[in-house]
Amino acid sequence: KHKNENINREMVVQNTLTFDITKQLTLNADYSFKWRLKEISNRSVKVPYSSKEGTTDYIDNFRSVDSYHQQLARYQTHNYNVYLRWAPTWDRHSLTLTAGYNGEMYRYHSLEAERLDLMTEDLSSFNFAKGEVTELSESIKTYATNGFFARVNYNWAERYLFELSVRADASSRFAPGYRWAVTPGGSCGWRMSEEPFWEEI
């Protein structure tokens, strides 16, 4: 009557919002939530054998134990993203300004227990166990991240391209005083194929 059971339940929710404030200004936001529940249970019973008629013995090894083991674990993840985009154009100039925020929150909670000697082989429950508690543990893990960003893109006639950006990111996994990091960046480009002289080549 050994029995192993593994149950997984999962739920995912996603929402997205796009709002055109003006023709050139847009607000974008999205949120997602993921929830998962995992349940693992193991029921072991002693394995009987008979060496002669009228007697019953039990195999004496780690596989022949009357026990019930259960683990319950729950996972939760929240993700947030919000950013504003402004993209004006005039003459042969194009400018795009983007600024926003993203964040994540994660939590894991697990309970695990095992107890020996159940009163009946037909029921798997700690309520029917009267033996030693061989395992009882709990695990909790959490973390959160936050990030702010800004970016400027400019191009003239799709020929000369410039970009400047900066990010500020933080994580609860690092010690206080060391959680934030600021990362600037920049680039420029020249699309030679858009030059008038290229048409003559």
List the predicted regions and their residue ranges:
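Outer-membrane beta-barrel proteins
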Residues: 37-42, 46-47, 52-53, 93, ...
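Surface-exposed loop/turn segments flanking beta-strands in extracellular/periplasmic regions
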Residues: 1, 42-66, 107-136
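Flexible, active-site-adjacent loop/turn segments at secondary-structure boundaries
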Residues: 88, 121-126, 159, 172, ...
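Secondary-structure transition/capping motifs at alpha-helix termini
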Residues: 89-92, 156-158, 189-201
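Extracytoplasmic loops and strand-loop junctions of Gram-negative outer membrane beta-barrel proteins
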Residues: 1-2, 60-69, 85, 129-137, ...
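Outer-membrane beta-barrel transmembrane strands
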Residues: 2-42, 68-89, 96, 108-110, ...
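Feature captures outer-membrane beta-barrel proteins of Gram-negative bacteria and organelles
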Residues: 181-190
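N-terminal glycine-rich FAD/FM-binding segment characteristic of electron-transfer flavoproteins
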Residues: 100-102
